[in-house]
Structures are given as structure tokens and as C-alpha cells.
Amino acid sequence: VCWDTFDAVILSSGVRDLIPRKYNSLSGGEKQRVQFARALLQLHSNGNELAGKYMLLDEPTSSLDIAHSLQLLSLTKQTTAHGLGSVVVLHDLNLAARFADNVILMHRGRIVRLGNVEHVFDDEALSEVYATKIIAERHEVLDRLVIYA
């Protein structure tokens, strides 16, 4: 990995301040951020070409506060501009609606619906999966889908 790539990943993933610290002294969220940066660096290790590569992230925001969750998902979304594909498992429907291009809604290990956010996250499908009334509507000010019970 060239130093420019290293610096870009370290800065964009927000782990620069964690470099001097021992891994065992980091919190769960800090470890999560370091692992994400490490994954990006490993993807870059065979050159700068990310096209055709994929990153699987299973609940990458589980130990993160909202600011770091937004930062990590924004960076994940930005990497798609460089050809890197991502499969992200999230249980936070609003984060999925905000950052996903396509969504797979699953229930008990089966795919219930597959497609873009507007198609997958409709009131009927969500209410059926979660067995409670779920409302998904476009927020006029935010100009994105917002989901609530």
C-alpha cells in the first residue's frame, strides 16, 4: 500500500488518533473502526484498483455511536465510486434506507423482498415482517425515506 493510500484511508476512516494506542486498550467501537480501516487497506494492497472487489460488513455499526456509524457508512458508500462493492448487514432500517442502493429484506432466513429502498421498504412488507405497524414515508426536508413504528 502506498503512503498516499494509507493516509487517505486512515484519515477518512477516522482512526488517525488511535494509531499510537495498543489494540487491547481500544473500546469496542474503536476496534470496529480500526478493523474497517484495515479491511480497506487490505483491499488496496494489490494496487489501487478496487473494481470487482467486494467487502462484506456484518453489523458494522453495532458498537459505534451515531456519528461514527454515519462516517463509516458514508465512507462505504463513497468506495462504490471507486468500483468497490459492499454487502452490508444492518438491522437499523433507517441507516439501510439512507445508505443502501439496493436492499434484501429477510425474515427467518428467507428473502421476503429484493430491490431498491423504495420498493423493499413499504409499509405492508415491513409490517408483515416485524408483526407490527411500520410506516415508511419520504421525509420532505431530508428528501429520503424515514421508517418508524
Please give the residue ranges for each predicted region:
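Catalytic Walker B motif of ABC-type/P-loop ATPase nucleotide-binding domains
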Residues: 49-50, 55-59
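ABC ATPase nucleotide-binding domains
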Residues: 127-149
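H-loop/switch region of ABC-family ATPase nucleotide-binding domains
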Residues: 90-91
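A short, surface-exposed alpha-helical micro-motif characterized by mixed small hydrophobic
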Residues: 96-98
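Conserved ABC ATPase "signature" region
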Residues: 2-18
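Conserved ABC ATPase signature
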Residues: 22-26, 30
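Helical segment within the ABC ATPase nucleotide-binding domain
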Residues: 45, 69-82
